[in-house]
Curated annotation (Swiss-Prot):
Lineage: Eukaryota, Discoba, Euglenozoa, Kinetoplastea, Metakinetoplastina
Positions of region (Disordered): 260-288
Membrane topology: Peripheral membrane protein
A UniProt-annotated Pfam family: Ubie_methyltran
Record's subunit section: Component of a multi-subunit COQ enzyme complex.
A GO MF label: 2-methoxy-6-polyprenyl-1,4-benzoquinol methyltransferase activity
Coiled-coil stretches: none
Further comment found in the protein's record: This protein may be expected to contain an N-terminal transit peptide but none has been predicted.
Composition bias, Basic and acidic residues: 279-288
Protein name: 2-methoxy-6-polyprenyl-1,4-benzoquinol methylase, mitochondrial
Any one Gene Ontology BP term: methylation
Length: 288
């Protein structure tokens, strides 16, 4: 699921080592996420897909760094449910396209196995870098990336690629770990991340791999910094929403023009500090 070669260079690790890290967790990645987050990641992802992405039949979806297919499956399920409510046959995705793009072939293989096992036969799987997407300009209505963008070495380039492949009116949706904003959670989260998670990782797969993942979380920009990066890539209507006291965050931006708009430096819309809030997009405030 992760862009291991470039991330490895950033952290001073060899490509072979970092590839080994993510290959080692590929078969247990989803299960380990359940154990290490106590299942909370499922609540975040449900809110992310159903309330923020809001998939509609007939749309084109690209999920980047989504090798095991979790978000793509949720998008597919949501489309089928919405299609049924509109009187569309729910077993087909006629006119809808869901594409998973990932640079890690083993993650993709695990996703394809699950797709075959659970009947998700309408999903396309593409092995490619999020920084060099093999898709035409304006090909998608929605670009999602869940717990993956922190591992891109050139995030500005990845965001520009997201802008390029989206249609005008298309939306960028990013779900990622972030900076804790609730003081009461800071110390417990630190103990959880650097105490329990690596030890649990050692029992389920290997400690080194999950210590590596925790370090990548710490290295990711804070909410405001990343929101500005999205603006700098040309997106409008940029906003973010903190989940569980800022442990995770949903970032949203809209491609409002064919070419990138001039970035603003205005402060973002205040984050909503509840995972139950919806992701209704509102205009950014004017710059001071």
């Amino acid at each position: 699921m992760l862009h291991y070669t470039r991330l490895g260079r950033n952290m001073g690790l060899g490509d072979a080592y970092v590839k080994k890290v993510f290959d080692s967790v590929a078969t247990k990645y989803d299960m380990m996420n359940d154990v290490l987050s106590l299942g909370i990641h499922r609540i975040w992802k449900k809110h992310f897909v159903e309330d923020c992405v809001c998939p509609l039949p007939g749309s084109k979806f690209l999920d980047v760094a989504g090798g095991t297919g979790d978000i793509a499956f949720r998008i597919t399920d949501s489309i089928r449910a919405r299609g049924q409510s509109f009187g569309i046959v729910p077993k087909t995705l006629d006119g809808t396209k869901v594409v998973v793009c990932d640079i890690n072939a083993m993650m993709l293989k695990e996703g394809q196995k699950r797709a075959e096992r659970e009947g998700y036969m309408d999903i396309d799987w593409v092995c490619a870098s999020g920084e060099e997407l093999p898709f035409e300009d304006g090909a998608f209505d929605s670009y999602t990336v869940s717990f993956g963008i922190r591992n891109f070495s050139d995030r500005p380039k990845a965001l520009r690629e997201a802008f390029r492949v989206l249609k005008v009116g298309g939306a960028l949706h990013v779900l990622e770990f972030s900076r804790v904003t609730c003081p009461l959670l800071s110390v417990p989260y630190e103990l959880w991340s650097y105490g329990f998670m690596p030890q649990a990782g050692r029992m389920l797969a290997d400690e080194e791999s999950y210590r590596y993942l925790v370090d990548s979380i710490r290295a990711f920009p804070d909410q405001e910094t990343f929101a500005q990066m999205i603006r700098d890539a040309g997106f409008g209507y940029v906003r973010y929403e903190n989940l569980t006291g800022g442990i995770a965050c949903i970032h949203t931006g809209v491609k409002t023009t064919p070419t990138p708009i001039t970035p603003t430096t205005s402060s973002d819309i205040p984050a909503q500090n509840t995972s139950e809030a919806t992701c209704e997009v509102k205009p950014e405030p004017n710059s001071a």
